[in-house]
């Protein structure tokens, strides 16, 4: 069962994708580690180095030494006296075993090349056949200026119209005028047709006062 499991793991698409991502992560880790080492530790410092602490104290180094020796000894004893229940199949090919170290070496080479390109300026070789079509042939006067000009003009018109409509009309004098006209119309409609009732009540009040005095 375990012998038949190894080929299925090596040939499955999911496991292949996981292995590829792992190898890419290994290469990237080696790349940025080497670049960090070259750019930070291998260069000249701008300020003189200053050591502000002393790590040669035996009270610090002795516990770390005992911990390291104890871990090495305990690991050797455990792996020597406790054997696995089933022997794992050793059917990995050579390229699979050495893939991690190969990707690490590839990442180191890539980091060194990037560092060399950072400190060395390379000029691209000009191609005279591309000068007419890319520089002054038709791109700038026909395409670049046309679309940019139309886009900027539309944005300017929209912005100006919105500012004029919102601040100068709706919230400015025209907005106040519309508000006052609406209030005047509402007040006028409330008093429309009531003049007869007012005159009638006034005349009736005068008549009652005359009758009461006589």
Curated annotation (Swiss-Prot):
What's the EC number here? 7.1.1.2
Q: Which UniProt keywords apply?
A: Electron transport, Membrane, Mitochondrion, Mitochondrion inner membrane, NAD, Respiratory chain, Translocase, Transmembrane, Transmembrane helix, Transport, Ubiquinone
Catalyzed reactions: a ubiquinone + NADH + 5 H(+)(in) = a ubiquinol + NAD(+) + 4 H(+)(out)
Q: Which GO terms describe its molecular function?
A: NADH dehydrogenase (ubiquinone) activity
Q: One Pfam family, short name please?
A: NADH5_C
If you read the UniProt record, what top EC class would you report for this enzyme, in one word? Answer: translocase
Report one GO cellular component: mitochondrial inner membrane
Where found in the cell? Mitochondrion inner membrane
Q: Which InterPro entries match?
A: NADH_DH_su5_C, NU5C-like
> Which GO BP terms, alphabetically?
ATP synthesis coupled electron transport; electron transport coupled proton transport
TM stretches of this protein: 14-34, 58-78, 92-112, 192-212
Would you say which domain of life the source belongs to?
Eukaryota
Principal location listed in the UniProt entry: mitochondrion
Q: Where is the signal peptide?
A: none
Bilayer topology term = Multi-pass membrane protein
Family the entry assigns: Belongs to the complex I subunit 5 family.
Job of this protein: Core subunit of the mitochondrial membrane respiratory chain NADH dehydrogenase (Complex I) that is believed to belong to the minimal assembly required for catalysis. Complex I functions in the transfer of electrons from NADH to the respiratory chain. The immediate electron acceptor for the enzyme is believed to be ubiquinone.
Name the UniProt record assigns to this protein: NADH-ubiquinone oxidoreductase chain 5
Organism name? Anser caerulescens
